[in-house]
């Protein structure tokens, strides 16, 4: 895997944050966590949701569409996705986007 350069990482983080805010506005039960991982040399994204929403087709379509977009733009450096930390764990320092955090910090 090729190391993500600083400017590319910042652009990727901005894109992820904007997407995450839109997703939690649409799917109010969703929480999105993300952070850069030195180990994986890319950004890790965790989509956190209650089990009853695991079969929401619109949600999965929107998440997969974003994943495809990121793969086209960043190739091997594209972020890695997981659901409810099934594939990897994020640290306590991960950014968290959810309705509560977005509402309390709109700036």
Predicted regions and their residues:
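Well-ordered, non-membrane alpha-helical segments in soluble/globular domains
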Residues: 13-19, 56-68
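Short secondary-structure junctions
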Residues: 20-31, 71-75
């Amino acid at each position: 895997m090729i190391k993500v350069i600083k400017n590319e990482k910042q652009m990727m983080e901005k894109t992820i944050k904007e997407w995450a805010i839109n997703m939690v506005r649409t799917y109010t039960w969703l929480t999105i966590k993300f952070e850069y991982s030195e180990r994986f040399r890319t950004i890790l994204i965790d989509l956190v949701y209650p089990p009853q929403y695991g079969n929401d087709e619109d949600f999965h379509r929107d998440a997969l569409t974003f994943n495809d977009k990121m793969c086209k733009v960043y190739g091997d450096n594209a972020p890695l996705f997981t659901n409810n930390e099934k594939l990897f764990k994020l640290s306590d320092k991960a950014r968290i986007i959810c309705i509560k955090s977005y509402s309390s910090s709109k700036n």
